[in-house]
């Protein structure tokens, strides 16, 4: 949301053949830009109104933008929005073709006599590239997950110049791409990743990463590392009502807020967020691996957004056990030993320390971490965006 009027310095659409352009900066009714830590790419939405005779078509006749370019999806969009206050830096997606937006779809098209209105749904280039490539490479068991993520971004998404912060992972992991899409593989690897800041083989409580894109590029971040960052130096204050455009502190005032979700006990029990029992069979030695995951063993090790320690309720008044003591979900699976290793030896087959991303530990911890991240969902409206 913006209090001051946005300043559109550039808002240009290129035709699919890049032979014609249309400047729509004067016809933008609304522009919404999204960075989402749960989305692997940027998205944006722009509502445009336009009068006829804006673009010269292929036949040389002046036409509307929708039919003159024409708009059919895949066109590039250059956007530059100046900062509308002393603290806002604005948005610039016009300096490098690698940062241009692409039209994913055109919706809400209304054509009247002499005018037209439509909505452009935009994505970053990698969202389209992701649909056209597949990863078939075999990644060795000696390579860290963070290095595999960098390889996929560079070789398959061709985004070597858009790599942001890639947190180093502690654990290596060998796998085969199986012709899956790059974004699918990276988000899958995120759930198997352990922060490199954890003590090797002793403290894996920080399992769980996030993969997302910002203006600075693609980021592969540990949830623990994100939570351990220093708080923002300014405090945001709930101030309902009108906000003055001349108020220097308007960027740090919350106009309205709503709590979309605050705990979902049954959902967490169904997912085994507190405690789960796991049965894994080694297909090489046929030795079963049976373990119980108990979140109480990790509560003190976790980084949280608040100061209070997570406390789970008791099951009933006659028992001292909490919801973190008894498994609420059972997992059954096969260990992927004997498929990726270069040497046909039994090393690591029954050694959980050398096992390829031991799911009995990492899967349980990452599931607990993701569920804790969604304990509360709050929707805030802050008048700080350009």
Task: List the model feature ranges, each with a label.
Residues 130-133, 149-177:
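N-terminal export/assembly leaders
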């Amino acid at each position: 949301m913006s209090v001051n009027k946005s300043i559109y310095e550039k808002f240009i659409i290129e035709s699919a053949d890049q032979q014609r352009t249309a400047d729509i900066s004067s016809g933008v009714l609304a522009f919404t830009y999204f960075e989402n830590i749960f989305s692997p790419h940027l998205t944006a939405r722009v509502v445009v109104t336009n009068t006829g005779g804006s673009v010269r078509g292929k036949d040389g006749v002046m036409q509307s933008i929708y039919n003159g370019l024409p708009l059919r999806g895949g066109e590039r969009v250059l956007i530059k929005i100046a900062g509308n206050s002393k603290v806002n830096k604005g948005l610039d997606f016009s300096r490098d073709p690698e940062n241009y937006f692409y039209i994913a779809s055109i919706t809400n098209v209304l054509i009247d006599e002499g005018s037209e209105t439509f909505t452009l749904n935009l994505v970053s280039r990698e969202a389209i590239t992701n649909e056209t490539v597949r990863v078939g490479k075999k990644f060795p068991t000696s390579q860290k997950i963070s290095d595999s993520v960098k390889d996929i971004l560079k070789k398959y998404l061709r985004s070597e110049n858009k790599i942001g912060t890639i947190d180093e992972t502690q654990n290596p992991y060998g796998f085969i791409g199986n012709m899956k899409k790059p974004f699918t593989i990276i988000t899958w690897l995120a759930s198997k990743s352990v922060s490199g800041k954890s003590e090797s083989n002793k403290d894996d409580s920080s399992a769980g990463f996030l993969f997302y894109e910002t203006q600075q590029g693609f980021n592969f971040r540990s949830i623990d590392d994100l939570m351990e960052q220093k708080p923002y130096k300014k405090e945001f204050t709930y101030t309902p009502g009108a906000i003055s455009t001349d108020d220097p502190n308007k960027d740090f005032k919350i106009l309205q807020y709503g709590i979309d979700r605050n705990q979902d006990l049954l959902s967490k029990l169904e997912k085994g967020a507190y405690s789960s029992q796991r049965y894994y069979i080694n297909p090489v030695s046929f030795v079963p691996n049976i373990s119980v995951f108990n979140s109480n063993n990790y509560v003190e090790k976790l980084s949280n957004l608040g100061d209070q320690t997570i406390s789970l309720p008791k099951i009933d008044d006659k028992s001292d056990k909490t919801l973190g003591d008894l498994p609420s979900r059972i997992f059954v699976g096969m260990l992927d030993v004997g498929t990726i290793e270069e040497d046909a030896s039994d090393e690591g087959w029954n050694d959980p320390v050398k096992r390829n991303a031991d799911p009995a530990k990492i899967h349980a911890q990452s599931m607990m971490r993701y569920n804790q991240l969604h304990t509360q969902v709050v929707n805030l409206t802050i008048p700080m965006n350009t």
